[in-house]
Amino acid sequence: MAHPRLAWELASSGHGARQTAYRIQVRAGGAGWAGSLVWDSGKVTSANSVGVAYGGPALKPRTRYAWRVKVWDGQGKASAWSAPRWWETTLSPEEWGASWIGVDNPEPLDFTGAAWIWATGASVENAPVGTRWFRSHLDLPGDGEVLKATVVATADDDFTLYLNGREAVRAPQQQDGWRSGRTADVTGEVKEAAGVVLAVSATNRAGASVNPAGLLVRLRVETSTGRTYELLSDAGWRVTDTEQQGWQEPEFDDSAWHPAVALAPYGQGPWGTGVSVAVQEQPAPLLRREFEVPGRVSRARLYVSGLAYYEARINGRRVGRQVLDPGFTDYDETVLYTVHDVTELLRRGANAIGVSLGRGFFGMTTPNVWNWHRPPWHSEPRLIARLEIEHPDGSRTALVTDDEWRITEGPTLSNSLYAGETYDARREPGPWTSPGFDDSTWRTATVQSAPKGSLRAQPHDGIEVIDSFNPERTTRLAPGVHLVDMGRTMAGWARITVRNLPEGTSLQLTYGEKLKPDGSVSAETSHVPGRFQRDEYICAGREEETWEPAFSYKGFRYVQVSGLPETSDDAWRILGRLVHTPLDEVSSFACSEPFYEWLDRAMRRTVLNNMHGIPTDTPMYEKNGWTGDAQLGTPVMTYAFAMHRMLSKWLGDLADSQTDDGQLPVIVPSGGWGYGDLGPSPEWTTVYPFLIREFYRVYGDEHAAREHWTTLTRYLDWELSRLREGLAVTALGDYLAPGYGGNPPEDTRLTATAYLYRALLDTAEMGEVLGAGDVVTRYRKAAEQLKTALNAAFLGADGHYRTAKDPDYRQTSNAIPLAFGLVPDNARDSVFASLVRDVERRGNHLNTGALGTSVLLRVLCAHGRPDLAHAVATQRTYPGWGYWHDNGADSMWEMWPLDSRSRDHYFQGTAAQWLYENVAGLRPGDAGYATFTVRPDARTGVDWARTSIRTVRGTAGVAWSQTAGGFSMEVRVPVGAIAEVHVPAASREEVTAPDGARHLRTDSGFVIYRVPHGTWRFTS
């Protein structure tokens, strides 16, 4: 950033304080305020205290700058100078002097030479439904050591493969599972035997009228002699249609079985070359380097990026608090690095640095529906780093990643954000991050090509372990199997400690948000076939061992621990670790209705559980940056937490994801999925203009609009270019309405058009701020045309919105136009009346999906029915938040029924916005709370409420109470802001207002005043 933006918060007693001018000074280098002066703004006449750009000479890289500010008040009186604050610049691109290093990408094993086989009676068009059992063998001559053995297999539809009697690889029960080949490293198993027997059970599931079956296998064995031996599926295999005792054991006699039928060589038949084989996963690499520090250290910085994740240690001590670092991006566009102050970790003389690397979304090997196992950037983990050391005499010592580093395979055998991690403690190399460690058996790290993305300093706070929790209870399910209940829904992982367990003991930790009927953990998903949310720890046999994952996180409440010997309870213990991006809580909410306070707590918890460098949809099932979820959740996020840095980063991700023609995907970042898959969808992707507008509203940040203006307008122009009959089209809609497991039944063009309409107006408003008059005019005209087309298509003669696809009245189809200002004046009453009738007809229940839910309560209040909003909000039967609450929820769920897939999904929890804006009554205005409104119009069922938020200008707040004797309200306005205060009363004569409060008008049961800075008390 060439021009850092500076801000300060002002405080003053009394009323009406304001800033009239400021002066900024900046010094470079030195400690505190000791450096040389590089910029003095002089006295600048301005009330602005937010986003003031540095205006001095070009900043130098790797330099600390201190700054301070003084201001003048309304009487022209100058303040004292503020205490100095500082920023530090990072490396320029040409200063790295480092190479990306790591291991070479393995050659994937394909099915070359193998044939699709099945039993007699099958053809390439069809085969009987059911399971068949196959066997074959490979003799090894024993003239050399087995260096590597790999097997790859698939079946139409699923299979389990055994090697010498041990299960080696499987595909879970599914249809069309043949599309994903499964790979396993079986080197250890093959080394133990003179030959190999493969035994496979494969199942053809009932399917379409054309339902072929087939098994495809290739085993490859590499030896020290340079010779390679293979076992391929072909007509030489044996098959039977009856399972027999011991059929998978190597000594089983299969002579009575029948020869298999070779249906087609790989690449032919109905399967073609459509099998995708994920690259076989290699253990997480460890990289190290020893180095000398020639003298005392005055300052040291480590600039580092490890893809997808890294953990670094210097002289045995951990670098930084971050985990799962750096943040996830589209690696073909942007690669983030972090900067660490490591001054205290270094010493004169011998030093060592060690880094371990994880896969994340950069090198994932777990097949999944979003294709994260094969994005365009997919590669093995790699590292770039520069350690720069400053000495008291001004000299510098630098260490960079190059081919002098050493590398080996570490004890983390596999790591996946979806599947979990396998860690073999027997492979721990000892104190490998300390000097003097013998790394003679390690290899030389190889220089790798750089990712395509630009290397940039990470702009947001890295993910951290935020808190730790002891379990609420532990239950024995079966011998060696225990269920741990953490007592809360959370994102993160479990840390396990064991004592005196035998070497080689394998413990499995399976994580889930809910339980199956038998009391075990539910941890399955069709989106990620096979292993899911399961860690495995293999014990080293020490007196005490403690381990926790390093490169994956889970969404869970329950942890099922399996593989424990039947020993005393004190042989093991679990600690829950809460993990997310650290976000300061900037607001509070409280009221006399306990259920409303639960809503607030549950929503805040759910939001935090989904903050991992990007705003995700669910920490358990997907971990994707669904744009629609973020759009619906942003008002709550920005009110509850300090979101500016993290959402600024995600705005960059949105820009990176844009195609040349302007399209945005429904998940961001994206590896290619979400454009044609469930896209385009304006209800989701208009998050881009919405966020930019909210940045100005909440933070006074107009820089975001300037930075993104070209990509923003390109996106909106693309949306306008594809209108049909004047309406926007979409692949999504009011998702997960009651009774529907996905899209709603109505014509989704209604909501698509409404969201595009709002996006055009949001962008036109920002265009006015930036002075982009041509865009303002064009987008306002386009918005009016959309409004006209929407009303012509969907506003019926009976006075409410309906579509030709409606099975019945649709609440969202009427609530969204009311919320977005799309309803013509002469139809507003009838549209609202229809909405009220339907809510009441349903026994005061909502009938909305995620889109309608976000506006329903606020619409009811805006049109004078806070009593109905209260009835809906507090409803305890399906569908409603109270239904979740009474069934044990402590977070927001994805769907209204009890069998909701995710129980940690914030997009149905947006009622929290209504709590802040209507129950407590504090609503953001614009320009970083330069203006805001206080209007508590949802007081039904509530005796008192209060909320406060620390804005960029200071704390704004409201606290009100009502009794039979009257109403009282206290409003707090920070310096530099003006509040419009709506006091419940029929007339001005009923209100006691403080001196200095300017009366504006009386409207709809409220007497309205304007007040500047200060604390103000009103009664009525």
Regions found by a protein language model. Give the residues of each.
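Alpha-helical support elements that line or immediately flank enzyme active sites
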Residues: 300-309, 313-315, 493-513, 548-551, ...
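Extracellular/oxidizing-compartment recognition motifs
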Residues: 1-64, 68-621, 629, 645-646, ...
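Non-transmembrane amphipathic alpha-helical segments
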Residues: 692, 757-760, 764
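C-terminal capping/lid segments that line or modulate ligand- or cofactor-binding pockets
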Residues: 353, 423-424, 622, 640, ...
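Helix-terminus loop motifs that line ligand-binding clefts
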Residues: 170, 317-332, 343, 354, ...
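Non-catalytic C-terminal accessory modules of carbohydrate-active enzymes
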Residues: 373-377, 382-388, 398-436, 457-468, ...
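Active-site acid/base region of carbohydrate-active enzymes
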Residues: 309, 400-409, 568-602, 608, ...
